[in-house]
């Protein structure tokens, strides 16, 4: 299997399966001298880990990360950083009945056709459990970006099924299990999820992620545009079926006079471009959003086939998130941070000595 590494200079390679012995990753390209501890990563891992509320999977994993290499006396050495998280709460017997079946709208069928074999336990490598290592790697990138460059990456849930948020209060994001920025919507989301869980069904969600303090100049046209790499990174997250940068698909209905982000000496008048112009950061906030599909692993019966092509009724009895979007905010933050870290290093390598006299504009 190829395709397990992301990035050009700041690279992240993950390994492991949902019900395997452990998950791991190798981070290469991190500059030396960054103060780094397991606690730096654990904070974000605790935000993502399962079993933290009644609205997520009840699989109980501590997700305790260990640093294996690349850190000496509390600082990065510039060598590969090895990380590992042991799996401790697998219940593989829950999946024995689907060992020879393909769940609808799942990776079972496509993995089987591609590799001729698959780990059916919890989805194996296709499970979102893999994203724990992305969050750990993203925490390293986030610390560097914030400490060295003043870049802050953060996200929130903006829609759960039919429920859309009306307010953006960053302080509120950390006060509820949904990462919801609108306190008035939390009880509605709780009631909706309680009813959904009783039905045995699932629902999708939308996550917004924002990076502030990004300097102008990051991005490598033509094929490695900043927004192209960001879309790639976000689209690689399990269950993501749509990505928007800035105004996204709303720009279809916008006229040019409305969509263009006019500039004044005091700053930009809008940010429909999402902080990226021509594939290069403009100095405005980088704004992206993702749409996550409802999980297909349900206890409600659905039509599928077995390995011989015979029709079967598929019922999934494992522990699953009724809304995968509830725990996706830290993952989206991590992937944006990894992209920005990679592009900062690439920009520094080629254009670090470029100086212009034009002032850097903010957003009014």
Swiss-Prot record:
Catalytic activity: 5-O-(1-carboxyvinyl)-3-phosphoshikimate = chorismate + phosphate
Cofactor: FMNH2
EC number: 4.2.3.5
Gene3D superfamilies: Chorismate synthase AroC
GO molecular function, one term: FMN binding
Alphabetized SUPFAM superfamilies for the sequence: Chorismate synthase, AroC
InterPro entries: Chorismate_synth, Chorismate_synth_AroC_sf, Chorismate_synthase_CS
Keyword Nuclease assigned: no
Primary role: This reaction introduces a second double bond into the aromatic ring system.
Protein name listed in UniProt: Chorismate synthase
Upper taxonomic lineage: Bacteria, Pseudomonadati, Pseudomonadota, Gammaproteobacteria, Pseudomonadales
Gene that produces this protein: aroC
